[in-house]
Every structure is written in C-alpha cells, then in structure tokens.
Amino acid sequence: MDKETARQRAAVLPGSFDPLTIGHYDIVRRAAKIFDRVYLTVFVNSAKKTMFSLRERTEMVNLVADEFPNVTGDVAECLLADYACERNAVVIKGVRGMIDFDYELNLSHLNRRINSETDTLLMPARQEYMEVSSTFVRELLRYERDVSRYVPPAVGRYLKERQNRL
C-alpha cells in the first residue's frame, strides 16, 4: 500500500446486494461524503440463496458506484475483516432498528477477533427507509410488482431491462 492510500480515510460497505436498495444507496451517498474512498463490495456467501447471480449483483453495485467519484464497486470472496484490513478501511453497516443493531454489534465483535484492527461504524437508516429491505424488494419482484420506489433509479432501470429479457 502506498503512502497516499494509507492516509486516505476508507470505508467498506459490504453486502450481498440482492438487490441493492434505496436504503443501501442512502448509506453509500452518506459514506461518500465522509470518506475519501468507499468500497461498495458484494461479498460472496455460498450459504446464501440469491435471486440474482453474482454477475447481476456486481453490475447493480457498479451502476451505483459509478455515480460517485470516490466509490468503487468490488467483489470479495474472503473474510470481511481481512478485506477491510487490506484496504486500511473501516466497515460501515446500515442499521434499521435494534434487531439490526444487535446483529451488527455481534458481527463487529467477531470481526475484531479475526483482526483486531477492524473497526465498524453503524450508520442509522433514515426513517423513510426503515422498512425497505432486499427481502421485501425480492418479494415484490416475484409477483412482478413495481419496485422503483425501493431501489435507486439506475438499479430500477437495470431490473426493468432484466425483466424484459426474461
């Protein structure tokens, strides 16, 4: 890592992004204002059944990353603690309520056990996005309902194009 990269304030915003929602987008937007570099990273979790392929999730992440000069879309197949440490970055997680908070707090402790340098910043979701989740969006998509209110515009266009191809 060069000296410039070491001085930058960097953050990793990890997820499966199946799909990326307006809530994720808001966290990215807010993180991009705070950090010099944000890694919007699709983490591969082989135990998780996804609606969208890794390629599709990566494409959606890149559409959002392209909107911000300091956000980079990425894919990782490793431990989050190792990924963050390699980039000298903090982990940012959005939390919608106490259930998310408790879950993410426990994960932050586990990440610290893996790598003591791993810090996690929990960012509260804005009230208007508290009920939005990828699970909810997937359910709407299964029934061919409009999801444009729940995903960023670029992701909405992507999903519409994908639906037209099917």
PLM regions with names:
Residues M1-L166:
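Nucleotidyltransferase catalytic core that binds NTPs
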